[in-house]
């Protein structure tokens, strides 16, 4: 059993190398920038060294970085200040998606008998809990307050979302649909924590479904068509839905959530697998099979792309928008600083509280 996004990534594992002549910074391997990305600077490179990285997440409170190493069956914690691995946690199963909050990492893990969500203490490296789940886990999301984890599941005759109450340690269910061939491809929770947006697919095509979390009822459905790879919630009541297929290749569909209608589209090409918005929703980082495409969501234009020299796997953006991390299938994480002041693109960053010493914040974990 594997996650839908990782199936696509495996299919597109052959890296296309385009001839480029942009500026290169040798301090982080063979990173190159293409297009109008003068505000991006290479901050460093993390050599995780445990094989391909499937996903990456940031714990917003401490800015701790966590990555899942699918081939090594472990989760690795990275110090954001030194850009060095703190340690790895053995998970006894193949990890894929990960979300993090409050010194906890929630990891979807495939084992021989079942799929599960494992909870890891990112300070001590202990596995605190495991939630075995029926069916196949294909998507993962967390509420803004970190109190609920949403898990998309696909079975042979139905799809649903398991809801984990992280405080009460209980699991509920939101039923979505029944029928053969259906799947859940992506999940997102809105800023209020009241609505869940679900990307679903069946033999007829794909849809984005809006669910009222408190009532567990579907409120609206938007027809998309092509297979959905990811989705994100932008500004002004808009959602960005990423699709790719052989006919149109990569497309970002713009959905008006108030009318539940597609109001625009951005053609990006390639075979993209992930879309992540900056905190102010002015930029979208799209993971393609050989680069990360950067979109301006204010103008719906492609600003440029980032080539890290390896096939990128996943992107994470710090909550102030000033740092972007690109994980790849070679087991590396490239860090990029984003300029704080860009006219018409970024709001002013809120001053953060003083950071604690890194050795106090992130004590060493037991190496897996």
From Swiss-Prot:
Disruption phenotype: No visible phenotype. Its main location: other. It is found in: Cell septum; Cell tip. GO terms for cellular component: cell septum; cell tip. Signal peptide: none annotated. Interacts with MmpL3 and TtfA. Stabilizes the MmpL3/TtfA trehalose monomycolate (TMM) transport complex under stress conditions. This is Seven-bladed beta-propeller protein MSMEG_5308. It comes from Mycolicibacterium smegmatis (strain ATCC 700084 / mc(2)155).
């Amino acid at each position: 059993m594997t996650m839908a996004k990782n199936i696509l990534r495996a299919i597109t594992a052959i890296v296309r190398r385009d001839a480029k002549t942009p500026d290169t910074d040798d301090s982080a391997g063979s990173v190159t920038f293409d297009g109008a990305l003068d505000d991006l600077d290479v901050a460093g490179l993390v050599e995780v060294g445990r094989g391909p990285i499937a996903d990456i997440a940031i714990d917003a409170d401490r800015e701790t970085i966590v990555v899942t190493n699918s081939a090594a069956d472990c989760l690795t914690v990275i110090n954001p200040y030194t850009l060095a691995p703190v340690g790895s946690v053995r998970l006894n199963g193949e990890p894929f998606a990960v979300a993090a909050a409050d010194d906890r990492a929630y990891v979807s893990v495939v084992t021989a008998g079942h799929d599960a969500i494992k909870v890891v203490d990112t300070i001590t490296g202990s596995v605190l809990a495991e939630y075995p789940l029926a069916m196949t886990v294909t998507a993962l999301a967390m509420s803004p307050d970190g109190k609920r984890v949403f898990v998309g599941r696909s079975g042979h005759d139905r799809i649903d979302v398991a809801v984990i109450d992280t405080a009460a340690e209980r699991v509920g269910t939101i039923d979505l649909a029944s029928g053969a061939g259906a799947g859940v491809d992506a999940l997102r929770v809105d800023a209020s924590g009241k609505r869940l947006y679900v990307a679903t697919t069946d033999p007829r095509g794909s849809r984005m479904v809006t669910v009222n979390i408190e009532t567990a009822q579907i409120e609206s459905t938007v027809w998309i068509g092509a297979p959905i790879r990811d989705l994100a919630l932008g500004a002004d009541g808009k959602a960005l839905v990423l699709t790719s297929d052989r006919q149109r290749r990569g497309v970002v569909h713009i959905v008006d959530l108030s009318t539940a209608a597609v109001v625009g589209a951005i053609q990006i090409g390639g075979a993209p697998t992930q879309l992540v918005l900056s905190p102010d929703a002015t930029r979208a980082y799209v993971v393609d099979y050989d680069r990360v495409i950067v979109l301006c969501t204010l103008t719906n234009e492609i600003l440029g792309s980032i080539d890290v020299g390896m096939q990128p796997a996943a992107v994470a953006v710090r909550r102030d928008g000033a740092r972007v991390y690109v994980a790849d299938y070679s087991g590396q994480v490239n860090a990029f600083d984003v300029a704080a002041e860009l006219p018409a693109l970024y709001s002013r960053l809120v001053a953060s509280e003083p950071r604690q010493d890194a050795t106090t914040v992130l004590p060493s974990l037991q190496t897996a």
